[in-house]
């Protein structure tokens, strides 16, 4: 009895170690019992205690094999592992499958396997590989699978020697994935078809690229494999990802973000972009003779998927009298009208391998406006086939990314240099005289009661103005005016880009900048508001000034006699109080008194009534029957276009609006300008 118990101990120990052994016979058990009894001292050190902290610990494997994973046993990094070798399963030993994370549910299984090279996409289902965009030439590659492996066969396809045997430069990538070969597209399609068909079954075709091309740009071919991390110089080990698929996706997004801001003068190799290749080009289209996809009209500068091809420098090489971009070099037009929309080159997708090049549709991509009305199919067909508009010029490109470039050879824009602001300002602005002019205008137009309300509002902030300006000398005042003009210089671009009626005023209420939409809404011309033309407005919105209800002003905005003699010929802008009715002016100055030295980022949003610009002739026209019928037509048909906006409030001379305004301060914390946005209440 004692012998059987002692003899069973080695068998249990062997089973605990995970090694399958044959059951010993009776003689072996007796022999083991003798050795166990006589040599207990020798076997004692060999029995390892699971709780002994000093025992050697087995190194944890990165990923267990399939058999060890199912048995929940410790595996090793080597393949086949020791346990599978002992069990005779070394031929079927391969990495186990882990449960995918939710964000990797659409990732291919091969992408999640560690230790795989650049070709880790499972392309077993891909038997045909197109070698040209029009699909005329294809190479059928048969995949051979390992019969011994039943889990994840590694497909093998024909690989192509893309580069020469000469050593590559540091800009070239070390390996080329066999998924998408690179070909020299300088050869004709017929030559490519013959060479490929004759050498597919004999030996892999070898196409060479010049050494200059390799040193300039390693991505000189029409196709590339995004599955190769070396193509983009990705250091996957430093990205702190547990799988290569997530690291490659993160690196691709970073690569695209890096190249998104490339300007036409940036080098593709400096930003890691694939946008411009060195010398490899597409051949001329054999059907039409037009430049192929990737060839520019002037210098034949090719492009690839990285940068926008329309942003290359080739428009600079055109004739000086040509004011539009040539689109025929991008999309061949002659005899291939369907190429403009359905077969246009697709955008580059980043999800998987080269098969994703055809995933985005050309109809969903930003299209090119050819400069004709596409509602007429006949005209569209003629324009697309010829590539010319009715006047014989090339169609204009309206892509938003070309906005900054189209201005260079279209209608030349006025060059604006902020240095002119500092050179032109030589004298400080006469704010004191302007406030005196404002006070005189308020006394002439408003009733004594409303004049008192405005005076109280201005008197509440007068001490703050005195305190902030008493330490300023002449140089400070000149610098203050330079700050104002420089800020106004920035707001001019904002006003032109914004479609909301906008005006900018000084702290005295004088108009300093105005948008075109405000002039359309109110009828006030920009030159009149800025004081460059005479102010012939007689509309005061039913003024409550003493005496008659009509205005007591002359043809011009009233000015101070001292200012007229001091600065003759100086432009006299219109005051903000001349644009609003009486109640709106009082409300504005009360809000301005609270906001001028209060919250620096505060704003006021309320309603007001803008006064239309009306001369005496306009006032007489408003009383005629023709204008009455025009107003009835507007009420029935609504407002349409610029003419309809201009007719708002034409009868009573007031346009009810909701407006928002804020106060901007200068470096001395003094209110510098007022920015106001208006929207009519229709």
Swiss-Prot record:
Sequence segments annotated as region (Disordered): 1-58, 131-224, 261-328, 351-418, 537-569
Any Pfam family matching the protein: PAS_13
Residue ranges: DNA binding: 65-93
UniProt GO cellular component terms: nucleus
Main localization (coarse): nucleus
Localization: Nucleus
Keywords carried by this UniProt record: Activator, DNA-binding, Gluconeogenesis, Metal-binding, Nucleus, Transcription, Transcription regulation, Zinc
Top-level lineage group: Eukaryota
Keyword Metal-binding listed: yes
Keyword Metal-binding: yes
Family annotation (PANTHER family): TRANSCRIPTION ACTIVATOR OF GLUCONEOGENESIS ERT1 (PTHR47659:SF1), ZN(II)2CYS6 TRANSCRIPTION FACTOR (EUROFUNG)-RELATED (PTHR47659)
Free-text function comment from the UniProt entry: Transcription factor which regulates nonfermentable carbon utilization. Activator of gluconeogenetic genes.
Similarity annotation: Belongs to the ERT1/acuK family.
Protein name: Transcription activator of gluconeogenesis acuK
Lineage per the UniProt record: Eukaryota, Fungi, Dikarya, Ascomycota, Pezizomycotina
Gene: acuK
